[in-house]
Design a protein with these regions (language model features):
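Amide-donor transfer/coupling interface in amidating biosynthetic enzymes
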Residues: 99-137
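Cysteine-nucleophile active-site neighborhood
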Residues: 47-113
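Residues at the C-termini of beta-strands that transition into short coil/loop
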Residues: 7-9, 30-32, 95, 100, ...
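Short, polar loop motifs at secondary-structure junctions
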Residues: 11-12, 30-31, 75-78, 134
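Structural motif
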Residues: 40, 70, 126-128
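N-terminal beta1-alpha1 cap of cysteine-dependent amidohydrolase-like domains
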Residues: 1-56, 62, 120
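Flexible, glycine-rich phosphate/dinucleotide-binding loops
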Residues: 12, 35, 80, 114, ...
Length: 137
C-alpha cells in the first residue's frame, strides 16, 4: 500500500515524519500524474484558500473532484473535502465552519507545561494554537 501526501503547502513535513515512523510507504503529490499508484491521499492542514488555488492551478482539483481516491483531510484538507460556504470538493457530507475559533491572525504560540514524566524529561515546549475549523454536522 502507498499513500500520497498532498505537498502543495501546509504541514507536509510533519506527515512525512509520522509516515516514516509508522513504516508507511508514501510519496508527495503535486501534479495529477503523482496520483498514479496511490491507495489513498492525505490532505494536510494549511490555509484552505491558498490550498484551493494551488489545487486548481496544478490540475489536481479536477482529478480529486471525481471522488475516485480515498482522502483523509486534516484542518484545511477537511474544509475542502466538506461542505461550507466556499467552493469545496464536497466529497464528504459534513458541514464545516472555517475559522470557528476566530481569524487566523488570532493564532498564537505559548509555552505549555507538562505535568507528567512520560516525555523523556521534557516538561515544557512551545504550543501553537491555531484557529481551526469546526465540524458542525
Amino acid at each position: 500500500m502507498e499513500i500520497g501526501i498532498l505537498a502543495l503547502q501546509g504541514s507536509v513535513s510533519e506527515h512525512h515524519m509520522i509516515f516514516r515512523k509508522c513504516g508507511v510507504a508514501f510519496h508527495d503529490v503535486r501534479l495529477p500524474k503523482d496520483l498514479n499508484g496511490i491507495n489513498g491521499l492525505v490532505m494536510p492542514g494549511g490555509e484552505s484558500t491558498t490550498l484551493r488555488k494551488l489545487l486548481k492551478n496544478s490540475g489536481l482539483w479536477k482529478e480529486l473532484k471525481k471522488g475516485t481516491i480515498p482522502i483523509l483531510g486534516t484542518c484545511a484538507g477537511a474544509v475542502l473535502l466538506g461542505n461550507c460556504d466556499d467552493d469545496t470538493l464536497g466529497l464528504v457530507n459534513i458541514d464545516i465552519l472555517r475559522n470557528a475559533y476566530g481569524r487566523q491572525i488570532d493564532s498564537f504560540e505559548s509555552e505549555i507545561t507538562l505535568e507528567t514524566d512520560e516525555f523523556d524529561g521534557i516538561s515544557k515546549f512551545p504550543g501553537v494554537f491555531i484557529r481551526a475549523p469546526q465540524i458542525e454536522n
